[in-house]
Regions:
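Chalcogenol-based redox active-site neighborhoods
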Residues: 1-165
């Protein structure tokens, strides 16, 4: 599968992925995006469990979770890590929102976040830290292609408020 780009004001591509987390959202160990219609959804992609930037971002969403829930917003974190890794990550940091396992990167490619990266002089393919804000009708209302991990949840909340979602 090749990378596509999901843009604002387009329908969010549907998917089903294995997940851990809230029984309100995770059904039979999976999350199906289209089943969340009627809820504003924050779909955030991150490179790897329990790494500094990803931990800062996850903890920012954890800290904003009460405010998100008050607004009826569902937060979904997605990485290529497996369910066992997600379980350890969620337990270690007290994450209350679902973490989805895109182990074959199909959904990361579908959303255009599987990209060439450079680190320490090496080039490799990996998940880019990006977020998609999806409205109650399944339309992408905002895309964040660059994220400041520790401040991101607050930025998302402000956007939800400004868009009246």
């Amino acid at each position: 599968m090749s990378n596509t780009e999901v843009e604002e004001l387009q329908p969010a591509p549907d998917f089903t992925l294995p997940a851990i987390g809230s029984d309100d959202v995770v059904k039979d160990g999976q999350v199906q995006l289209s089943a969340l219609r009627g809820h504003t959804t924050v779909l955030y992609f991150y490179p790897k469990d329990d790494t500094p930037g990803c931990t800062a971002e996850a903890c920012s969403f954890r800290d904003a979770d009460h405010e998100m829930q008050k607004r009826g917003v569902v937060v979904l974190g997605v990485s290529a890590d497996d369910i066992a890794s997600h379980q350890k990550f969620a337990e270690k940091y007290g994450l209350s929102f679902p973490l989805l396992a895109d182990t074959d990167t199909t959904i990361s490619q579908l959303y255009g976040v599987w990209k060439e990266k450079n680190y320490a002089g090496k080039t490799y393919m990996g998940v880019n830290r990006e977020t998609f804000l999806i409205d109650k009708d399944g339309i992408v209302r905002k895309v964040w292609p660059k994220v400041k991990a520790a401040e991101h949840a607050q930025e998302v909340l402000e956007t939800i408020e400004s868009l009246g979602l």
